[in-house]
């Protein structure tokens, strides 16, 4: 089965920066990787930002456009079916910043995808400078991403003070509690890069 890794986070959180490092790591380990860039816009800017990763061990596919969730899910499902036939070891999905993780899991459970793919790593990239106030919809997405992640990456932590980093972690905890998520946010699941001097 092909392992699918998911990298979630709001627009500007640092998903593409992490994706570049992660894809380079996987290809250095000998994996044949396909990056699936998923964006609601007509032009997929993130796909342009990772073009230099293309090579013998790394390919890029995109899903762009689509005015509603159903259209987007159908396009993702169709793209995953075609990718399953091409012999990748790993697929790394970077969805748009407005993405419901549960909908992605539903797509992976559909036939025939459930026979070809297995869920691998789920990363939630959260900006250490996360605003204190978000819309109710953004709070829900933040909680959904944090609840589903095996690892939470606090990005741009080198630009944040210790108080701002702690505030972002507290915000995550509040978002999970507001959604009545029983998951306890363990600090061991949050990776905070050390500030650079």
Go through the PLM ranges and name each one.
Residues 180-188:
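Short mixed-charge
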Residues 2-8, 13, 17-135:
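Nucleotide-state-sensitive switch-loop elements of NTP-binding domains
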Residues 99, 104-117, 126-179:
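Conserved C-terminal guanine-recognition region of P-loop GTPase G domains, centered on the G4
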Residues 190-196:
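Conserved small/polar residues in nucleotide/adenosyl-binding loops
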């Amino acid at each position: 089965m092909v392992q699918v890794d998911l990298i979630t986070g709001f627009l500007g959180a640092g998903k593409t920066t992490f994706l570049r490092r992660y894809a380079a790591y996987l290809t250095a380990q000998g994996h044949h990787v396909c990056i699936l860039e998923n964006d609601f816009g007509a032009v997929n800017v993130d796909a342009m930002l990772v073009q230099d990763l293309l090579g013998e061990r790394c390919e890029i596919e995109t899903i762009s456009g689509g005015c509603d969730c159903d259209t987007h899910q159908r396009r993702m499902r169709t793209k995953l079916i075609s990718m399953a036939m091409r012999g990748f070891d790993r697929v790394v999905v970077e969805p748009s910043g407005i993405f419901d993780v549960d909908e992605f899991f539903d797509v992976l459970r559909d036939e025939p995808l459930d026979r070809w793919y297995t869920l691998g790593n789920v990363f939630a990239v959260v900006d250490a400078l996360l605003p204190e106030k978000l819309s109710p919809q953004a709070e829900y997405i933040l909680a959904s991403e944090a609840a589903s992640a095996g690892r939470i990456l606090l990005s741009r932590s080198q630009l944040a003070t210790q108080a701002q980093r702690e505030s972002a972690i507290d915000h995550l905890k509040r978002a999970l509690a507001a959604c009545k998520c029983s998951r306890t946010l363990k600090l061991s699941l949050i990776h905070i890069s050390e500030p650079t001097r």
